[in-house]
Amino acid sequence: MTDARDSRSEERASLRSAIDQTDARLVRTLVERRRLAEALGALKAGDGALVRDVERERVVLDRAVALGREEGLDEAFIEKLFQLIIDDSLRRQRAGLDARVRTATLNEARVAYLGGPGSYSQFAADAHFAGRYSAVMPVIQRDFGGIFEAVEKGEADYGFAPIENTTTGGIVEVYDLLRDTRLKMAGEHHYKVEHCIVGKAHDLGTVRTVLGHPQALRQSQRFFARHPELKIRAVSSSTEALNEALTGKPDIAAVAGRDAARLFGLNVIDASASDHPENYTRFVALAVDPEPASPLLPCKTSLVIVTSDAAGSLVSALDGFRQEGVSLTKLESRPIAGKPWQQMFFLDLDGHEEHPNVARALQVLHRHSVSVHSFGSYGSDRLEPAARATGK
């Protein structure tokens, strides 16, 4: 009996060793594929070709799924795996092109954002500017207006502000500040927000008060509806909430992320505070005179327009995008200060102002608008997954 167990134990160890060796070969193959993709990206840049080739992605994906099917592998598994591989290739090629076109010599960037250590803005800013600059020097602000002002006064190289959330929608304070700014958009970053209740306590039953930024509290309404015994209090930033949870009484907690709890040495008391598990905040980077984005990169363009009061004027202004096959990813209306019942419209579209179809659509927009102001074209960090050919 003992000999049989020993034999099976040796067999398991042998199989695990073989799996480890196979995993190592897989990783080395992925590294080699990445190197090839980067070399291809350099050739594309030299030829002035777009980074993304959707038709080529379909060919790669269809072939991989077909090969997997022949070997008895699940189609959905292969499709998901190669979508991740293609996404990595695109991001590496984009980073390479971004480095080629950037002329800035800053080793570190001064970035104005809301809050401080432990805030979602800090983690998102660090992620966005990583690889672009050797360090991010925070210029901490207590409100959104301070972010814009710091950049306009030259106290920061960039502003970094949340502009919309998948749960609560557009952040109107930021849209209202965009109405009157001379700043341009220099990039965007989609950050996954996972709200937790964090503090010195180990059990939610000992918590009496929970602090958080108003947006975080708004995105956790269902959690607090389930716990009416908790008193909630809005503060100016997640950092303020974390500091009070750290230095205050043990019955005080904060709404923050896991990384913030780790940074402050606090416990994650409850990890289910978010109303929705797929909760993302889109941040925009703002600058006085940002580096121009290459039209070869996946880009977005943002504008604000005012149309006349005539019936159908907005439809006419936007019709060029339909005609030219340009996707509008955002249309947000805001009132015009001092002009009751009149609206301005903020637009985000996929594409660069220099793309011919975008340029033609913008001509139609200008023709049917009272005013048009562009915040510029900038690299988009959101890539739609590669898709197989229709019907496959």
What residue spans do the PLM features occupy?
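Domain-level signature for soluble enzymes in the chorismate/prephenate branch of the shikimate pathway
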Residues: M1-K392
